[in-house]
Amino acid sequence: MTAQIINGKAIAEATLSETKSLIDKRLEKGLRAPTLAVILLGSDPASTIYVRNKRLACDKTGIRSLAYDLPDTTSEAELLALIKQLNQDDAVDGILVQSPLPAHIEEKKIIETISATKDVDGFHPYNIGRLAVRQPTLRSCTPYGVIKLLQSTGVRLLGLDAVVVGVSNHVGRPMALELLLAGCTVTSCHRHTKDLQASIARADIVVAAVGKPHLIKGEWIKPGAIVIDIGINRLADGSLCGDVEFDIAKTRAAWITPVPGGVGPMTVATLMQNTLTALELGESDQAPA
């Protein structure tokens, strides 16, 4: 068996095209396009690339992008003041603060200061809570993108055994909630899991999100499983790899995402969707009190 590759780039492009079409229809009706404020602190090379990709996606879809490129010496108080200003600006629909943040800034405080209605990353406790009670609005971008990748396979997800490796607040935990919402039976694995191999060996769906190169061995994969590799790791030779041992896993899985070119593009595409959703929710007055 050789797995079919889930082409995240192609699916992301289709998602961006769909979002652009919806925005174009708004403009035809005399309505405005969404606006996304993107805040970048410092000049970390990876963060700079991520922000550039997000701004390019705004250009593709017709979303207005506001750039706030600040020095990494920006104080927490200054960043919070900017966020509060953007929260009050009715012309701004989404606010994104690129992580990681400098050590002197508390990420939790930043996330919770962004208005839940403008939290297009889907990190705010309010939005995670809505997902937990099966009433999602602004969904965490990477997990939501993974669901779209899974749906692209045409495989019926209802009742499948899904294992999520990693329990981070931004990816692992909301990923488990998304899979529950899709009707899967979900197991979350972490550093205290006693037998990771046994959990993965019985999984119909494996989602890896830990950031450790080749943590998940290819021979652990159940024949016919779907493997989604969210991890992206740079090796000593400069090459990129995921959390899953791809070359062996692809001989056992039915479907698998590559690294790079799998999940990453979908994260950006769902961010654009969320920005449009935030505008529409604001217009329909479905915001939290």
From Swiss-Prot:
The keyword RNA-binding does not apply. The keyword Nuclease does not apply. Signal peptide: none annotated. GO terms for molecular function: methenyltetrahydrofolate cyclohydrolase activity; methylenetetrahydrofolate dehydrogenase (NADP+) activity. It holds the Pfam family THF_DHG_CYH_C. Disulfide bonds: none annotated. GO terms for biological process: L-histidine biosynthetic process; methionine biosynthetic process; purine nucleotide biosynthetic process; tetrahydrofolate interconversion. Keywords: Amino-acid biosynthesis, Histidine biosynthesis, Hydrolase, Methionine biosynthesis, Multifunctional enzyme, NADP, One-carbon metabolism, Oxidoreductase, Purine biosynthesis. It catalyses: (6R)-5,10-methylene-5,6,7,8-tetrahydrofolate + NADP(+) = (6R)-5,10-methenyltetrahydrofolate + NADPH; (6R)-5,10-methenyltetrahydrofolate + H2O = (6R)-10-formyltetrahydrofolate + H(+). CDD domains: NAD_bind_m-THF_DH_Cyclohyd. NADP(+) binds at residues 166-168, 232. It comes from the Bacteria. Pathway: One-carbon metabolism; tetrahydrofolate interconversion. One of its GO terms (cellular component) is cytosol. PANTHER family: C-1-TETRAHYDROFOLATE SYNTHASE, CYTOPLASMIC, C-1-TETRAHYDROFOLATE SYNTHASE, CYTOPLASMIC-RELATED. Belongs to the tetrahydrofolate dehydrogenase/cyclohydrolase family. NCBIfam families: PRK10792.1. This is Bifunctional protein FolD. It comes from Methylobacillus flagellatus (strain ATCC 51484 / DSM 6875 / VKM B-1610 / KT).
